Amino acid sequence: MRRRAGPEPHDLLLGMAPAHLPENAPAWVCAALKAGWPVVVRRAPADPARVAIGVRGLAREQRWAGWMPLAAITRRLRPEALGQREPAMLRDLPAWRALRDLRAPLNALGLAWGVTGGAGFELASGVAVLHPDSDLDLLLRTPRPFPRDDALRLLQCFEQCPCRIDLQLQTPAGGVALREWAEGRPRVLAKGSEAPLLLEDPWRIAEVEA
């Protein structure tokens, strides 16, 4: 499976405006775009002129799925551009403590990694969306097979953190949960732009394209 040249899942995009919304979009979505908040790329089949995006609000239930014209993109922030950032508001939250603790072991892997989810949104926008019970969502780019022993060691490292860590391995087949791969399951769920796949090896191209 070839890597997409344009925006990829978990990228944050700037440039979407209320004018790009359908008439039935919720008022809070329009307000978020007026405020200049980024939108996040979601998984969906490729479209030549648009990218599937999600808009988030301050409330947990405020999530909206839509489409953004590719021509409207003014800036693209990938998850790995956020890993070394500090939040604009220095709040002593478990997720931020975990991020600081994990930078060294993640950097030591020699692979690109970054922050996604609410933490990534807050790092990119400066809007405080995390709370004391928030998870820390991470992405690790693994274009080549990631040894299960390494995955298990990383998972054990996460268990020492003050909050739940949800790391996704970005493989040729799509996103795979680190926990599933580390636990040695015979097949793991790979989330790609099309339907999710249960695969023995998400790095084996023949299996991915079958």
From Swiss-Prot:
Which sequence ranges form a coiled-coil region, renumbered to this chain?
Answer: none
Give the catalytic activity: apo-[malonate decarboxylase ACP] + 2'-(5''-triphospho-alpha-D-ribosyl)-3'-dephospho-CoA = holo-[malonate decarboxylase ACP] + diphosphate
Which Pfam family is one of those matched by this entry? MdcG_N
Alphabetic keyword roster: Nucleotidyltransferase, Transferase
Q: What class of enzyme is it?
A: transferase
* Molecular functions (GO terms): nucleotidyltransferase activity
What positions does UniProt annotate as the active site of this protein? Answer: D135, D137
**What EC number(s) would the UniProt record show?**
2.7.7.66
Function of the protein: Transfers 2'-(5-triphosphoribosyl)-3'-dephosphocoenzyme-A to the apo-[acyl-carrier-protein] of the malonate decarboxylase to yield holo-[acyl-carrier-protein].
Q: Which HAMAP family match?
A: Malonate_MdcG
Question: What family classification does the UniProt entry report for this protein?
Answer: Belongs to the MdcG family.
Task: Return the protein name.
Answer: Phosphoribosyl-dephospho-CoA transferase
